[in-house]
């Protein structure tokens, strides 16, 4: 049985005060939670602060990006070794904001995936279609292409212990969200697509939903059999709202 994971992507938000306050409030709100794994991905410069603030809790540390290089003359980049050294475990790659604003290709994201696996870190591979692709009926085609960039170059075995986050681009930060049935259909397609290469691996892959997940829609999303948690943006910046999502995942997957 898959153990759900809810992860907060703080994006470009935070300050020393905010990190300390938010993590302290999360510790309080999530004190009794055991049926859902929790991770947070603060901005890089606050990773160590967040790690110290979360020490002794069940909150795992994550990061929002990684470089393909381990060291050298690559100004402004952060390596997988550095993230591992500071204690980050769940590393987001392929987020639509990176694909759009930084022109990251499927091939580059696949390289990041490989580097993370080599370092024993957990890739959180974001995939998803734009509004135009959705309206053109290309959702499955796009998701398959983004998965195949890894699957066809590294094989199915590398997906063991990996997290995939399905984030329809049209739903990120827009207030729009796929219906639970729509999200489930895509999640099932993703699992079935990997299962063509290895059914056992596909069954254990955690597939999160992302895209305007909030306290109001989380419970219904998590009742779907192939939705194993959420990658949460804006709602992860408020401890009470984030906790509602975590507890909804715990309750749904216990049922």
Curated annotation (Swiss-Prot):
Biological processes, Gene Ontology terms: gluconeogenesis; glyceraldehyde-3-phosphate biosynthetic process; glycerol catabolic process; glycolytic process
Keywords: Cytoplasm, Gluconeogenesis, Glycolysis, Isomerase
Pathway: Carbohydrate biosynthesis; gluconeogenesis; Carbohydrate degradation; glycolysis; D-glyceraldehyde 3-phosphate from glycerone phosphate: step 1/1
Active site: 95, 167
Xref: SUPFAM superfamilies: Triosephosphate isomerase (TIM)
InterPro entries in the cross-refs: Aldolase_TIM, TIM_sf, TrioseP_Isoase_bac/euk, Triosephosphate_isomerase, Triosephosphate_isomerase_AS
Pfam families: TIM
Name this protein carries in UniProt: Triosephosphate isomerase
Gene it is expressed from: tpiA
């Amino acid at each position: 049985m898959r153990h759900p994971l809810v992860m907060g992507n703080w994006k470009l938000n935070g300050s020393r005060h905010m990190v300390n306050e938010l993590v302290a409030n999360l510790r309080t709100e999530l004190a009794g939670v055991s049926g859902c794994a929790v991770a947070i991905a603060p901005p890089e410069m606050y990773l160590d602060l967040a790690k110290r603030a979360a020490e002794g809790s069940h909150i795992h540390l994550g990061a929002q990006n990684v470089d393909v290089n381990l060291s050298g003359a690559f100004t402004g980049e952060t390596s997988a070794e550095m993230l591992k050294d500071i204690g980050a475990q769940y590393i987001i790659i392929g987020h639509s904001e990176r694909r759009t604003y930084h022109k990251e290709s499927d091939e580059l994201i696949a390289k990041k995936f490989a580097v993370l696996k080599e370092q024993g870190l957990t890739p959180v591979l974001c995939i998803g279609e734009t509004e135009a692709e959705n309206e053109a009926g290309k959702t499955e085609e796009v998701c398959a292409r983004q998965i195949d960039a890894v699957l066809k170059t590294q094989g199915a075995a590398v997906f063991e212990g990996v997290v995939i986050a399905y984030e329809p681009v049209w739903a990120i930060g827009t207030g729009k969200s796929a219906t639970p049935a729509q999200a489930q259909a895509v999640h099932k397609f993703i699992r079935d697509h990997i299962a063509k290469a290895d059914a056992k691996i596909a069954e254990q892959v955690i597939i999160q939903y992302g895209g305007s997940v909030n306290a109001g829609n989380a419970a219904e999303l998590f009742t779907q059999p192939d939705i194993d948690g959420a990658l949460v943006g804006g709602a992860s910046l408020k401890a009470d709202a984030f906790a509602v999502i975590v507890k909804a995942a715990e309750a749904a997957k216990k049922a």
